[in-house]
């Protein structure tokens, strides 16, 4: 299960710089401890393995912690497209039968009337629960109950380009296999072609894809746990910001869609940046 993976990563890799967002850093074990607190919070709220718990936020540290806690608790994580509004968002919440929703303040204006318990990232306007309330739930270990490897770990929604979005069910085993597959591919390229893609000191990847997308979730975020790689969060895509972050944070890996690669290559000042830290650039999709 995902919980097993998170624990094995801690045993194999120990502690390492894991999440960086706007100058704030969290180590892997620190992040996992916050995830354990969040899992304990879910248990106190009556969330059981197999229940659906949603996340509707822009990329942020709390998004990562929420996913780790939900997955390790054995609940089904439902990453909702944070660009949705109105009826589209209501459809996702109702169709997935959410028991609880983690949301940021910007999205809360569209979700506050929905019939689901909500936790807000920051909260200056209401009496709703916040992440501060979540992290006050101290849990030294994961809750006793857990999922099985064939239970649904994450429910990702399609874009709905030909109709209503469809929920794609990924089991714990399928997600773990995907992570191990990507990691093994990187190792094999090192053995066969002499290319170093993952096993480098101070590896850092730019999180420039929304976490509600499979690329951001699995090939950037979750692969980084096994690869002992720091995730440098972009809250919103901007080519100038990306070039600055690659240079200043010494990013080693970046993935994305072809339009992002085009943005970087055709930036009017791309030659002014030191991008020598990059060892791997990937792009796919539309």
Region locations from a protein language model:
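Structural core segment of the AMP-binding/adenylate-forming
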Residues: 44-45, 72-133
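Conserved AMP-binding/adenylate-forming core of the ANL superfamily
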Residues: 2, 17-60, 64-68, 85-90
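Adenylate-forming
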Residues: 58, 103-110, 209, 237-238, ...
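A short helix-loop-beta submotif of the ANL/AMP-binding
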Residues: 52, 58-78, 82-86, 94-100, ...
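Conserved AMP-binding A3 loop
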Residues: 27-29, 153-181
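Conserved pre-ATP/AMP-binding loop-to-beta segment of ANL
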Residues: 140-157, 164, 195-204
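ANL superfamily adenylate-forming
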Residues: 107-149, 164, 176, 267-268
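Conserved AMP-binding/adenylation subdomain of ANL enzymes
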Residues: 176-204, 212-253, 267
